């Protein structure tokens, strides 16, 4: 039994939640998010008295999985439109730099060419000190996906600790090869 799905979600006073057939619209001070519910799912969403309750119509494995997932997605949407989400990255390495021009993030990560990433329209990206990047927005999934898209260009490596790291991330360092030659 999904315990996460049975939790009651309280809606903040400055957020409005509207439900149509298979679409849940969450509006708040930071924006609006639309959650598409799977067609034919037996999950019922009840919005009343600033509370959201999810109930499932049957005990099939698929329905049980969606029960907890929908609860988490709705909770993330409520948090996103009130507080927002952000991921902070830092560039560690000689010559690693980032800059913003118009709606393009320019990264120099030791390759022979710069990397230009188009910033999605619903995300906000800021660059501080040329080595710190902050990705923020109301959709938790999109913020995380764009942060990973930046990070995949130079994943942190364990020998020198260089790469694109999340803020406060610690890389477990490995010892390099030791000279084994003459005895």
From Swiss-Prot:
Question: Is NADP tagged as a keyword?
Answer: no
For biological process, the GO terms are: cytoplasmic translation
Which terms does the record give in the GO molecular function aspect? rRNA binding; structural constituent of ribosome
Keywords assigned by UniProt? Ribonucleoprotein, Ribosomal protein, RNA-binding, rRNA-binding
User: What cystine pairs are annotated?
Assistant: none
InterPro entries in alphabetical order: Ribosomal_uL6-like (IPR000702), Ribosomal_uL6-like_a/b-dom_sf (IPR036789), Ribosomal_uL6_a/b-dom (IPR020040), Ribosomal_uL6_bac-type (IPR019906), Ribosomal_uL6_CS (IPR002358)
> Per the similarity annotation, which family is this?
Belongs to the universal ribosomal protein uL6 family.
Q: How does it assemble?
A: Part of the 50S ribosomal subunit.
**What's the protein called, per UniProt?**
Large ribosomal subunit protein uL6
């Amino acid at each position: 039994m999904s315990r996460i799905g049975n939790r009651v979600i309280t809606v903040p006073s400055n957020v409005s939640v509207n439900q149509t057939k298979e679409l849940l619209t969450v509006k708040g001070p930071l924006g609006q998010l639309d959650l598409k519910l799977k067609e034919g799912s037996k999950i019922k969403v009840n919005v009343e008295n600033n509370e959201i309750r999810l109930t499932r119509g049957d005990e099939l494995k698929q329905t049980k999985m969606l029960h907890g997932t929908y609860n988490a997605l709705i909770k993330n949407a409520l948090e996103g439109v009130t507080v927002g989400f952000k991921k902070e990255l830092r560039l560690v390495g000689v010559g690693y730099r980032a800059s913003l021009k118009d709606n393009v993030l320019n990264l120099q990560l030791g390759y022979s060419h710069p990397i230009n990433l188009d910033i999605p329209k619903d995300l906000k990206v800021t660059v501080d000190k040329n080595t710190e990047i902050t990705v923020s927005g109301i959709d938790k999934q999109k913020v995380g996906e764009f942060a990973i898209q930046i990070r995949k260009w130079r994943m942190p490596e364990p020998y020198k600790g260089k790469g694109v790291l999340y803020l406060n991330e610690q890389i477990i360092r490995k010892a390099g090869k030791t000279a084994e030659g003459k005895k």
